[in-house]
Amino acid sequence: MELFELTLHELHDKLAKREVSSVEATRALLARIEATDSRVNAYITVTPDEALAAAEAADRRIAAGGLTPLTGVPVALKDIFVTRGIRTTCGSKILGNFIPPYDGTVVAKLREAGAVIVGKLNQDEFAMGSSGESSAFGATKNPWNLACIPGGSSSGSAAAIAARSATATLGTDTGGSIRQPASHCGCVGLRPTYGRVSRYGVIAYASSLDQVGPVTRDVTDCALMLGAVAGHDPLDSTSIDLPVPDYAAALTGQVKGLRLGLPKEYYLEGLDPDVKRALDAAIETYRGLGAEFVEVSLPHTDYAVATYYLIATAEASSNLARYDGVRFGHRAAGAANLIDMFRRSRAEGFGAEVKRRIMIGTYALSSGYYDAYYLKAQKVRTLIMQDFMKAFEQVDALLTPVAPTPAFKIGEKVDDPLQMYLSDIFTIPVNLAGTCAISVPAGMSAAGLPIGLQLIGRPFGEETILRAAHAFEQATEWHRHTAQL
């Protein structure tokens, strides 16, 4: 087995036994990036010099007895996390040359743990997208089929895992942006409860919906990554001050007696036959493991996509007002005056999808429409939250599809925003409710593309869904399938 093929926990074990050095593992991964990324385009920026220096420091730390689960492990970050001294673009021309002067909290935590950051990953521009096609740095390709999308917006985070060009990655999830690409690329992707992980130093899209989470090769790696980045942060006012459990200790493999809910609104006509087949098989696997199933209802599901696209775009309209060409980012040349410079900098710097969402959000917040659109959407969001809380009175977790179809062809939906937005129909409600969910590999389509299942937990119920995902993983072989590049 090549070093780049090792999972995080397998590499950790080899580092602990001194069977391999961090420098060796990092060199192997950098060579893998060099060999694959011209085809996959998972990375925007690769940092070999910084990575090798960090690997050398990690080897010294290991020799001194300072090993943590992440020490010496090469990881990569979605290009939405500010990284001191390393270009951070958020997939946009407007930040094409932005080099932050500080690290975001999760980046600082990874560095403190001794992780080796090898680069910044491609994404939909400002995390606005479901396919990885809206990046100013070119579309990311799905390693399972280079003609297909990897999902978005954390496209590079999932594609790098599938291509074995990162040992573990971090992404963000605003409406499904971790879980959907994880499903399409055959990875494990976790969106933690809102407030579980600090957002300080995450470039904002929709502040009440954004959350940081890991994309990994298996559930054990996911638990280790979450444990490294979770926790209260005084720099993030929405961060929750709760103890961080030992997530890896929750992976007992036992789900006997676990009550899993099947929301009837998620199992309707129109679900892709391959997805339905994978979900039916997963349900039978869980039955065999001793889990119990209960039909539940989330009656306001039909309103989730419309609600999300009003709230998220309204928040984006506000958050992206800061990009004006004055203090940082792209500045248009030859402007006649200050107002002209604002207009031209934004017109040149933002892509089409970002402009579309800014306009929708500005309209929803405008005088005369605020009550009819934004305020009503917030009321419906409360109803969606209540739906989940009622469901969790009956069950421990929910089992649903992640996406209505496997990965589609690049360019197939780019001219049909509504169809693109509906790609997240099963993931968006979780973000509106603020709770946690995980995508885990559960099957393959007839065309050889991965399919994931989604486990949704109650707020701060990450241990439960990790345990359930791990039990499924142990009972199946889907996570062992690898893309052939």
Curated annotation (Swiss-Prot):
Entry coiled-coil feature ranges: none
E.C. designation(s): 6.3.5.7
One Pfam family matching this protein: Amidase
Enzyme class: ligase
GO cellular component terms, A-Z: glutamyl-tRNA(Gln) amidotransferase complex
Active-site residues (renumbered): 78, 153, 177
Top-rank taxon: Bacteria
Molecular function as annotated in GO: ATP binding; glutaminyl-tRNA synthase (glutamine-hydrolyzing) activity
Biological process according to GO: translation
Role this protein plays: Allows the formation of correctly charged Gln-tRNA(Gln) through the transamidation of misacylated Glu-tRNA(Gln) in organisms which lack glutaminyl-tRNA synthetase. The reaction takes place in the presence of glutamine and ATP through an activated gamma-phospho-Glu-tRNA(Gln).
Family label: Belongs to the amidase family. GatA subfamily.
Assembly with partners or alone: Heterotrimer of A, B and C subunits.
Protein's name in the database: Glutamyl-tRNA(Gln) amidotransferase subunit A
Phylogenetic placement of the source organism: Bacteria, Pseudomonadati, Thermodesulfobacteriota, Desulfuromonadia, Geobacterales
Gene coding for it: gatA
